């Protein structure tokens, strides 16, 4: 099983846990990452993720994300095909960086694209032609636990 975490889901364990939803999502991400470490799940990284992470103003968040992604077995370099697919996704209402993430996940044949972004979840789920399932961290735990 291959999983692509977007930056917001990858960073969720570092967010303030004041809200129950955030705390539960953080634990879900950590649980799935532990399955990645044990080799039960294949983690995907990408040039788009590396770019987005590099823009963070928090050195702790950069260190955390790069450490997690160093365990990825697959690294997706942006190419013409990914850029073309991302442009189509942008035309359908996905923001440009999210579109690059989704196109990268499709290129890597990710089973799941995990995000905490409600708008991206809604839009991604409404697209019947995506080659990856857009899912929240909480839903992902349910899927990998089966």
Q: What does each of the following model-derived ranges do?
A:
Residues 77, 96-99, 115:
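Short beta-strand scaffold positions
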Residues 62-83, 87:
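Helix-adjacent hinge/juxtasegments
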Residues 59-68, 123-129:
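Short, aromatic/basic amphipathic alpha-helical patches
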Residues 9, 49, 82, 100-101, ...:
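Alpha-helix capping/helix-boundary segments
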């Amino acid at each position: 099983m291959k999983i692509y975490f977007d930056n917001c889901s990858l960073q969720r364990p570092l967010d303030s846990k004041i809200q129950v939803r955030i705390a539960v999502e953080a634990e879900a991400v950590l649980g799935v990452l532990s399955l990645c470490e044990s080799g039960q799940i294949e983690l995907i990284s990408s040039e788009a993720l590396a770019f987005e992470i590099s823009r963070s103003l928090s050195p702790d968040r950069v260190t955390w994300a790069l450490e997690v992604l160093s365990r990825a077995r697959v690294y997706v370099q942006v190419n013409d095909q990914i850029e073309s697919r991302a442009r189509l996704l942008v035309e359908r209402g996905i923001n440009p960086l999210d579109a690059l993430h989704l196109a990268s996940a499709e290129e890597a044949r990710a089973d799941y694209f995990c995000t905490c972004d409600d708008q991206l979840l809604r839009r991604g789920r409404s697209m019947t032609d995506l080659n990856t399932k857009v899912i929240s961290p909480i839903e992902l735990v349910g899927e990998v636990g089966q």
